[in-house]
Amino acid sequence: MERAKEAILREVKKLRRETESDFAGLGLLDPASRRVTWRIVVGSVSSRTPNMTQRPSVGLLGMAIRSGTPVCFDPSRPGAERARTEDPILLAEGLAAAVFLPVRTGSDTAGVLLLGRRLTKDYTDAEIARAVRGTRALGAQEEWWRELSAEAAGWPKR
């Protein structure tokens, strides 16, 4: 099981580096508990982040899951500060710019990749396109997700 987690971690680190992000996190969607749990984090400044769970129907994370498309946190939009303070990851990590990308395995959403920056520098279309290609490649590795799902079954429910 560690093989799958290590491979996914390697890909998340690669996407963080290629998009010049300060933070990258992979939240896994658990249909049984109806929560997203942040199990893989890179560049975290908060010890709370790996233990956080979120409802997959709320906020920017929920919009990405429901729409199946990337959702950007744009600090210049009206209501942006409220969106930021209502999202525990954006708040805990001090992210000023972020993009939430759904990770699909087949026809199911397995999780969400969050890329973020602590300085206000919006993601370009090219960076988002690169991240989308990366999430598609992650989702295509079905054996990784099977191993990770088996491991997640033993995780505590929150």
Protein language model annotation of sequence segments:
Residues 23-25, 87, 100, 112:
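Short hydrophobic/aromatic beta-strand element in the GNAT-like acyltransferase core
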Residues 97-104:
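A short, aliphatic-rich beta-strand micro-motif
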Residues 107-117:
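Sensory beta-strand/linker motifs that couple input domains to effectors
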Residues 5, 117-158:
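Juxtadomain coupling helices with adjacent low-complexity linkers
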Residues 76-95:
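Signal-transducing coupling segments at domain and membrane junctions
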Residues 45-81:
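Regulatory sensory and allosteric helical modules in signal-transduction proteins
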Residues 3-26:
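Amphipathic alpha-helical coiled-coil segments that mediate homodimerization
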Residues 26-48:
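GAF sensory/regulatory domain recognition
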